[in-house]
């Protein structure tokens, strides 16, 4: 009988593919925890928005993040640019030293908290969820295998310094590359597997809940193929999980924000990435959801 139960359990595991155990831990009232937030995804998570345009568009932000925000510290593996130490959030932590990502806007929200917050950013421009992170059958792929150990190492480094890290959630800005794949509706299954694995692998540092903030990919009908299918998959996942939130970026639906692409120069417009003010807004919106 026991062997039959074991066999049945194994069959169920094969059928479900990515079901894993995950149980948020209870907070110890005797411990002061240090809040950690994750940023993952592709180029609009890495950040291709040019910071110099904020010198005139948002002088206060430009001055603040040229110097650095001491209340929010970040470490990152961003397009193979690696910062293993936690340093103040500032400009230049994007796709290259001239660009920034959602960490700037998110820091504006996190710095309102009483204590220091930490961001771990693990992103790769052009990366595809279903072929490079986790596929719909539950197979872990190269960027999952790269970034999750990096995140765990950074959490352990906080522990070694006497901190008590608590992973509060993640902002996920990805999906553009997946729009080129066939069977786009499978994005939902892949995302579900990805988050199931991630929460399981980081379970040691998750207390009470894990907020997941997703964002629509830009729907302009030029760069991406049927982006509405990817966005529907994202919305479906968030609708099913009480601690998941989806940022609508089309500016039309209720509660949506309006983002604009990089058309800040006289050069060829960049139809794949957000302009500087839009990236600020995206990061702030993600921050407001992730601290709920």
Region annotations inferred by a language model:
Residues 22-292:
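Cell-envelope and extracellular/periplasmic
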Residues 16-17:
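C-terminal motif of bacterial Sec signal peptides marking the signal peptidase cleavage site
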Residues 2-8:
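Sec-dependent signal peptide recognition
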């Amino acid at each position: 009988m026991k062997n039959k139960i074991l066999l049945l359990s194994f069959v169920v595991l094969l059928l479900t593919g990515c079901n894993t155990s995950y149980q948020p831990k209870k907070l110890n009232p005797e411990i002061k925890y240090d809040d950690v937030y994750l940023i993952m995804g592709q180029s609009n998570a890495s950040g291709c928005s040019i910071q110099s345009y904020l010198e005139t568009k948002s002088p206060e932000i430009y001055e603040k993040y040229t110097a650095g925000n001491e209340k929010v510290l970040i470490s990152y593996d961003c397009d193979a640019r690696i910062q293993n130490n936690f340093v103040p959030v500032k400009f230049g932590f994007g796709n290259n030293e001239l660009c920034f990502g959602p960490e700037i806007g998110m820091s504006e929200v996190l710095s309102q908290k009483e204590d220091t917050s930490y961001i771990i950013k693990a992103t790769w421009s052009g990366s595809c969820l279903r072929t490079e992170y986790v596929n719909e059958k539950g197979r872990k792929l190269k960027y999952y295998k790269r970034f999750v150990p990096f995140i765990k190492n950074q959490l352990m480094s906080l522990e070694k310094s006497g901190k008590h890290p608590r992973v509060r959630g993640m902002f996920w800005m990805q999906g553009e590359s997946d729009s080129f794949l066939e069977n786009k509706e499978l994005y939902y299954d892949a995302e579900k597997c990805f988050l199931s694995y991630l929460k399981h692998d980081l379970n040691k540092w998750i207390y009470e809940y894990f907020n997941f903030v997703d964002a629509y990919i830009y729907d302009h009908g030029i760069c991406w193929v049927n982006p509405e299918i990817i966005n529907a998959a994202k919305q479906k996942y968030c609708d099913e999980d009480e601690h998941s939130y989806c940022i609508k970026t089309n500016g039309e639906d209720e509660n949506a924000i309006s983002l604009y692409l990089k058309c800040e120069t006289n050069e060829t417009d960049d139809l794949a990435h957000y302009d500087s003010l839009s990236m600020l807004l995206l990061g702030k919106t993600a921050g407001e959801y992730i601290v709920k």
